[in-house]
Amino acid sequence: MNAQLIESDDEHHWVLLDHRVTQLVIDRSSIRIQTWSLDGSADIRLAAAFTMQLASGATRHVEPADTERLAPCLALVGLGVRSVTVTRNGTLTLAFSDGSSISASPDVRRSSWDVQGGGILEGMAYAGEPGIELW
């Protein structure tokens, strides 16, 4: 199996094996990261500000609507996705094979992110909605 879910009361931690970022889609108000393996896929949409920790250790605050500043995200294409972690209070963290990561907190005004899995990741379905605990 290419994925394992580790559940606790406060978080769901999905460990992914052999998953790579196959597409990065940019539109006017969000970015979409698509990951794929032979057994499953995940579609992750980020529609509010998030923090990107680069492999070099540098940190970038990224606003998806500010397309001129999305350049660091381009380096994600082709990287392995090591894990997807969602907390009960609505924080999403993605960890990549080069040591970089993305962390998206809930936004008080709008849906800030969503995750949808397919194949063996069918149970991976979360949405970072304002003011809502996820489980």
Outline where the language-model segments fall.
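Surface-exposed, interaction-prone regions used to assemble/regulate multi-protein complexes
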Residues: 1-135
